[in-house]
Amino acid sequence: MFLGTHTPKLDEKGRFFLPAKFRDELDDGLVITRGQDRCLAIYPTETFVEMTREIAKGSVSVKKVRDYQRMLAAGASDTAPDKQGRVMIPPMLRRYAALNKEIVVVGAITRVEVWDATEWEKYSEAQEEAFADMNEEVFAEQ
């Protein structure tokens, strides 16, 4: 499980130090892909494979299914942290999330999200007020 908020820096090669508490779950491999809300999502490889099996069950005759499968797969990059615990984010994904040197790495239970620091600040401030209401809605749906 991924929890917490961290603020590593993105270096000139597009690498950042993965927080130590996330490394055990991601050392065997990870997939970086487009996330929702213009962030990046990082999944353990096994979790990503399970997720894509479910997505692959959708009918390719449905345009939205095709589009989603295509965009998810085209934006995905499989990798592993290097010996120092750094992860390299491909240029295309850095552009998608508008990442600069200042980033925020967020544990989001089943995945790790990587945000541009300014965008994370805007997003989290906007969501803070609605958090209590979200709790009622999320648990009412289960």
From Swiss-Prot:
Swiss-Prot/TrEMBL keywords: Cytoplasm, DNA-binding, Repeat, Transcription, Transcription regulation
One GO cellular component term: nucleoid
Gene3D superfamilies xrefs: Transcriptional regulator MraZ domain
Pfam families: MraZ
PROSITE patterns listed in its UniProt record: SPOVT_ABRB
CDD domains hit by this protein: MraZ_C (cd16321), MraZ_N (cd16320)
Record InterPro entries: MraZ, MraZ_C, MraZ_dom, MraZ_N, MraZ_sf, SpoVT-AbrB_dom, SpoVT-AbrB_sf
Subcellular location: Cytoplasm, Nucleoid
SUPFAM superfamilies: AbrB/MazE/MraZ-like (SSF89447)
GO biological process annotation, one example: negative regulation of DNA-templated transcription initiation
UniProt-recorded Gene Ontology molecular function terms: DNA-binding transcription factor activity; transcription cis-regulatory region binding
Chain ranges of the SpoVT-AbrB domain: 5-47, 76-119
Keyword Zinc: no
Predominant localisation class: cytoplasm
HAMAP family, A to Z: MraZ (MF_01008)
PANTHER family: TRANSCRIPTIONAL REGULATOR MRAZ
Subunit structure: Forms oligomers.
Family: Belongs to the MraZ family.
Entry protein name: Transcriptional regulator MraZ
Lineage: Bacteria, Bacillati, Actinomycetota, Actinomycetes, Propionibacteriales
Gene designation per UniProt: mraZ
